[in-house]
From Swiss-Prot:
This is Uncharacterized protein C8orf58. It comes from the Eukaryota. It comes from Homo sapiens. Residues 326-340 have a biased composition (Basic and acidic residues). InterPro entries: DUF4657. The lineage of its organism: Eukaryota, Metazoa, Chordata, Craniata, Vertebrata.
Amino acid sequence: MMGRRRAFAVDGRDGAGEGLARGCIVPGVTSTYRRIPDAAHGCSSWERGDKFRGVGREALFLKLASRDSGVEMAVGDSPLAALPGLSQDSLDFESSGSSEPPAQVGRLLASQKLGEVLERSRRLPTAPTSLSGQHRSLRLASKPEREVPLGAGQQESMEADTDLEAGLEEEAVGGLGPGAWACLPGQGLRYLEHLCLVLEQMARLQQLYLQLRIQRPPGDPGEEESTRAPLPSPLHTPGNRGQGPWELLSQTEHTGAKAASPPKVEVPSANPPRLPETPVEPTYHLPSSQGHKRDISHWDKVKVLLNRICRRSHHHPEPPAPPDGSDPRIESRDLPERPQCRPHRKTFMPSLVVKKQRAKNLSVG
């Protein structure tokens, strides 16, 4: 027993069989065959110059026919007439009053139509792409848009949306600067690339810094002498004309004389025959870690030696002044020498000083 049946009138194209088909009950399964477009109708629409519309209608009707499940559906604005063979076939299926040859002819027509439907359904997957290409060419030529298949229209809209989004993204990325494009949200690979570039730049800066540290070590003696201020001498006054051992020590420190070379003993301009009693200790080129400690100990030794010289000068009796007082220059010359603690006049051999210094070098080494 059929699920649903519907009574409707079937009209032939030539008007024949009008009385037979009126008021008959036809099963709904035959509505599938009623929606198959006639080949002559499709050819006439193409001959009119509207190829695009004809292909669109065929695709639309095929889609409606595939959706049909036995219930008759609305066809739309383009009504199609029912085939007389189908109506006779349905009448023969229900009633036994029809003749056999028209039924065979109707079955042959139905089989032919089914073959055409199968061929068109095989061609259907390639149809939307070609139709979308034709539609794009027509749209570029500024022609009015007509009927478009449903599947092709959806595909075109999706492609247009994706193209529009890609174009907007390219414009947004291109409008930004070279450093801002890496900070876009969602751009994971670009962000990682930016981080790699930053790390490489930091590594290069660290390598340059290490090279500078190697080329210019921190224990540079010239740099330490420039940064370290000399200790002020309590016995040295700028107004004194006579220059004592303090100036000799400062000169040997600034010139940086080597330990192996003998020291240059400079004779003061005020008293040329006078020489310092204590030998001048040479400066040593020591490493940067022990240089400052050795300098402090060196100054302590110098202070101790100067104190001893002052004590010895106080213990020695002063030379008697001349009775006539004809040479006041000597007294005026001796007055500024007392606070400076000038040593008494003594003679010594320079070779002995060199030997003492060598002995000290050996003891230090």
